Amino acid sequence: MIPARPLSGHSSLLPLALALSALLLAPAAHAEKADRDKPINIESNRLEYNDATKVSTFIGSVVLTKGTIRITGDRMVLTQVGRNAQTARVNGTQASFRQKRDGMEQYIHGVADQIFYDTRTDQVTLTGRARLQRQNCNQPVDEITGGHIVYSASTETFSVDGQQRGERPG
């Protein structure tokens, strides 16, 4: 279930948030096995929902959590793409992604201008000034940078493109 909790002072969103939470379920496999069956929770300052298109737009201090997964940004567009799947496009001044690695005290941490999360493929795509780190006790162990990074949470693999998609080499 995806409860969308309004921040204090925004209780008028509660009925809409409750209706939205009944619609959005997301079972998916993740690097951290404990994340698989966790619900998605989203917090933001404002929520706009279109029932016809199944698109929710969260605006202001957006935080998506699912188990150990945490994605933050200024704005997120969440689209229902099937019965049990969603995509989330997060924008912001360096949107961020973090997930605990399975069976160890390490995290994968990424930042980019835009982050795209797809529950169907269990992939996170970072675009624009993208950086991905493997961290141990919040200290970087490895780091990669590029215009476009695709990270597969289920296989813990990634691919990097030095330029953003559509950008031509100089």
Predicted segments, located by residue:
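Mature-chain termini and adjacent capping regions
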Residues: 1-170
